[in-house]
Amino acid sequence: QNECPWKPWC
């Protein structure tokens, strides 16, 4: 998925 789940805009 995303490599930065702590960034909702990633």
Curated annotation (Swiss-Prot):
Disulfide bonds join C4-C10. Its target is unknown, but this toxin may modulate voltage-activated calcium channels (Cav) or calcium-dependent potassium channels (KCa). The cysteine framework is C-C. It is found in: Secreted. The modification 4-carboxyglutamate is found at E3. One of its GO terms (cellular component) is extracellular region. The modification Cysteine amide is found at C10. The keyword Transmembrane does not apply. The keyword Isomerase does not apply. This is Contryphan-Ar3. It comes from the Eukaryota. GO terms for molecular function: ion channel regulator activity; toxin activity. Keywords: Amidation, D-amino acid, Disulfide bond, Gamma-carboxyglutamic acid, Ion channel impairing toxin, Neurotoxin, Secreted, Toxin. Expressed by the venom duct. The modification D-tryptophan is found at W6. Belongs to the O2 superfamily. Contryphan family. PROSITE patterns: CONTRYPHAN (PS60027).
